[in-house]
């Protein structure tokens, strides 16, 4: 993991906008790790990303109880994975979650529970409370495969 950046998002709308922006950057084989405490907005960010990539306001339930929700889209299978209830990384192997396929993108909530199995070349978004009740601070840590894709300040590529 190499590049680090920090963003301040003033409200839920900005969190969703970040998800929509990231949707256009995804490639097959990507892993996006969403970290942060309960209720911080990980699922909202993932939901906005999935809907933007789908190009429609599809239903995107939280995968808290199913562990995995699959979204087969035109060019990618997005797997929204919630590891909150996973106690041992070996459980992921039992679920068939070892390595994303070349046409898959994994969005993982609570990735800390599978740290040894995660690829080094991933995008991590750590969400934390901001200075106002609805604000969030997002810490991005990007692996080498993400460096050329992430916008720099003032860059409007996405």
Where are these regions (language model features)?
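Short phosphate-coordinating micro-motif centered on Lys-Gly-acidic
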Residues: 5, 88-158
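Conserved nucleotide-sensing/catalytic segment adjacent to the nucleotide-binding pocket
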Residues: 59-60, 64, 68-110
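Hydrophobic anchor at the beta1->P-loop junction of P-loop NTPases
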Residues: 32-34
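P-loop (Walker A) phosphate-binding loop of NTP-binding proteins
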Residues: 37
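Conserved lysine of the Walker
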Residues: 42
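Phosphate-binding P-loop
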Residues: 24-29
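N-terminal pre-Walker A segment at the start of P-loop NTPase domains
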Residues: 2-21
């Amino acid at each position: 993991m190499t590049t680090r950046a920090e963003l301040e998002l003033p409200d839920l709308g900005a969190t969703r906008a970040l998800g929509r922006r990231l949707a256009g950057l995804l490639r097959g084989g990507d892993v996006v790790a969403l970290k942060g405490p309960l209720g911080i907005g990980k699922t909202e960010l993932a939901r906005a990303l999935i809907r933007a990539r789908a190009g429609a306001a599809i239903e995107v339930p939280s995968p808290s109880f199913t562990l995995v929700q699959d979204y087969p889209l035109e060019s990618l299978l997005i797997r929204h994975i919630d590891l909150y209830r996973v106690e041992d990384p070996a459980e992921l192997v039992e679920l068939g979650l070892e390595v994303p396929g070349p046409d898959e993108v994994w969005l993982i909530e609570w990735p800390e529970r599978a740290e040894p199995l995660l690829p080094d070349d991933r995008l991590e978004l750590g969400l934390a409370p901001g200075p106002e009740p609805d604000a969030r601070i997002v810490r991005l840590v990007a692996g080498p495969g993400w460096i050329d894709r992430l916008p720099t300040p003032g860059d409007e590529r996405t």
